[in-house]
Amino acid sequence: NKERKNLSLNKPTFASSTTYGQPSDATDGKKDTRWAAAKAENEWIYVDLGSVQPVGGVRLDWEASFGKGYKIQVSDDAKTWKEVYKTDEGRGGVDEITFPEVDARYVRMFGIELGWWFGYSLWSFDVLGGTQPSEGLSDVHFIRLTLKDKSGKIVSENNYWRGNDRLDFTALNTLPKAELK
């Protein structure tokens, strides 16, 4: 399993309120800094990734004051938000959340129910990159190409190997048949 890139590292970060630290303390990559919100539900923190990017999850490292209920939302403009994850069973500690990959510039944790006496508090708010393959082949792929003549006899068989990710190439079977002479 490939480690996903932390897209939020040192990116501009904003919050509805702050009672401890700064919002940027949740995205600075340090283990000894944190952000905490006012003691209220409906508090939030969001990060600006700088451009629209594929996002496939978040990692929330809660301090003792965690979110029992919260949503993860994404946006292209920081005004209109789309929910990609919601829970009312948060237990604190580290929540590593994955969701179907979505393109977004802004990612927000929106608290809806406090899990402790104080406001939401995060050691880190990591936005995890998606798993979309980059241009060309990724680290490992295996493709087997077989060419057959009209009678079904194999005339060429080639194997190509490269990469670490498994991909489904069955769509190659839907390509039009090539005419060989």
Each predicted region: which residue ranges?
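Short beta-strand-plus-loop segments that form exposed binding edges in beta-rich domains
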Residues: 110-117
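Short edge beta-strand segments in beta-sheet-rich domains
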Residues: 94, 120-122, 140
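Short tyrosine-centred short linear motifs in exposed loops/low-complexity segments
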Residues: 53, 103, 137-139
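Short, conserved beta-strand segments of beta-strand-rich sandwich/propeller modules, principally
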Residues: 57, 106-108, 140-144
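Short, flexible loop/turn segments at beta-strand junctions in immunoglobulin-like
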Residues: 98-101, 134
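Carbohydrate-binding surfaces of carbohydrate-active enzymes
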Residues: 1-6, 129-180
